[in-house]
């Protein structure tokens, strides 16, 4: 496509802005991530003496790092509008977020919209594709205790066993509360045809805006984390206090991400900011764990039903530009999620000052030794 004289200045500015944003992102990572690693190393004695306090401090730094990623999109004009139930009400309980997956920007969107939900981000465990392990943020996720899952039928059984072991070793010992899971097992554009063929073959719902979810990881999580009452039934969100310290998993948060015109944001756009300001819409529904079946077939059916409902939610959004009202309400109410510019300035200042401090400390010891 030929570029007109009128478009040339705008495209030139877009290129310059993208290069400036990329340069800042690189510098931001070079000061923030090594500083995080240095703090974690220096705090290892505390991990031995007071593990809970160590993981609390680590979680706060982890939240700040995710806040920096969120700020890259925020200052590019990529904002979030929230719909449905208010998940702040369950921010102190254990929960699993089931999220539809369209692009890499989904992760960035969640990093942004969960920043104002108390300590949720600090105490969160992500389940993400193993490819993220090799990104700039991979080392941080490894330290924090996120789980990288390898996709593919040949890996499936092994990965589920590894997930079970990972939860047993890291979830409660690190005082985690929420788990973020993308049950579709991949991006919409990559899985849609396969999912539709599977649905047609097995007489299952034919979906366009989402794909049929996989139940394996969800089942492992529920079996590992749902506290059992003495009668054997799962302890739901409204159950009485259990004898054990933890009430176990209490909620499933069905999370639906929608982009205007069904055009998702990828992580390159989030970093470079070459797309016009965009409002991403996130819809929440909360289900008590006592209403979620644990048997494999029943759980699979339950998950399918949730994604059929996601399909309807997204169809309504793409037609009207808004999500439908919840049951019992005449109008759907949206809430604009905002980030504090002062808070962003403070965490960025801390990152750069920490980077400067650690650089000087390492340089000092290097000169002493060599």
UniProtKB/Swiss-Prot annotation:
SUPFAM superfamilies found in the cross-reference section: Glycerol-3-phosphate (1)-acyltransferase
Instruction: Check the record and name the CDD domains matching this protein.
Output: LPLAT_LCLAT1-like
Motif, HXXXXD motif: chain positions: 101-106
Which topology term describes how it sits in the membrane?
Answer: Multi-pass membrane protein
Q: Which principal EC class is assigned to this enzyme? A: transferase
Q: Which reaction does it catalyse?
A: a 2-acyl-sn-glycero-3-phosphoethanolamine + octadecanoyl-CoA = 1-octadecanoyl-2-acyl-sn-glycero-3-phosphoethanolamine + CoA; 2-(9Z-octadecenoyl)-sn-glycero-3-phosphoethanolamine + octadecanoyl-CoA = 1-octadecanoyl-2-(9Z-octadecenoyl)-sn-glycero-3-phosphoethanolamine + CoA; a 2-acyl-sn-glycero-3-phosphoethanolamine + hexadecanoyl-CoA = 1-hexadecanoyl-2-acyl-sn-glycero-3-phosphoethanolamine + CoA; 2-(9Z-octadecenoyl)-sn-glycero-3-phosphoethanolamine + hexadecanoyl-CoA = 1-hexadecanoyl-2-(9Z-octadecenoyl)-sn-glycero-3-phosphoethanolamine + CoA
Does the UniProt entry include the keyword Repeat?
Answer: no
A molecular function (GO) term: 2-acylglycerol-3-phosphate O-acyltransferase activity
Key words, A-Z: Acyltransferase, Endoplasmic reticulum, Lipid biosynthesis, Lipid metabolism, Membrane, Phospholipid biosynthesis, Phospholipid metabolism, Transferase, Transmembrane, Transmembrane helix
Q: Which GO terms describe its biological process?
A: phosphatidylethanolamine acyl-chain remodeling; phosphatidylglycerol acyl-chain remodeling; phosphatidylinositol acyl-chain remodeling; phospholipid biosynthetic process; positive regulation of fatty acid biosynthetic process; triglyceride biosynthetic process
Which residue ranges run through the membrane? 22-42, 342-362
What EC number(s) would the UniProt record show?
2.3.1.62, 2.3.1.22, 2.3.1.-
> Its domain of life?
Eukaryota
Q: Which Pfam families match?
A: Acyltransf_C, Acyltransferase
Family, as annotated? Belongs to the 1-acyl-sn-glycerol-3-phosphate acyltransferase family.
Q: Per its database record, what is this protein's job?
A: Lysophospholipid acyltransferase involved in fatty acyl chain remodeling of glycerophospholipids in the endoplasmic reticulum membrane. Selectively catalyzes the transfer and esterification of saturated long-chain fatty acids from acyl-CoA to the sn-1 position of 1-lyso-2-acyl phosphatidylethanolamines (1-lyso-PE, LPE), with a preference for stearoyl CoA over palmitoyl CoA as acyl donor. Acts in concert with an unknown phospholipase A1 to convert palmitate phosphatidylethanolamine (PE) species into stearate ones.
Domain-related comment? The HXXXXD motif is essential for acyltransferase activity and may constitute the binding site for the phosphate moiety of the glycerol-3-phosphate.
What is the protein name given in its UniProt record? Answer: Acyl-CoA:lysophosphatidylglycerol acyltransferase 1
What is the organism of origin for this protein?
Answer: Homo sapiens (Human)
Give the gene that encodes this protein. LPGAT1
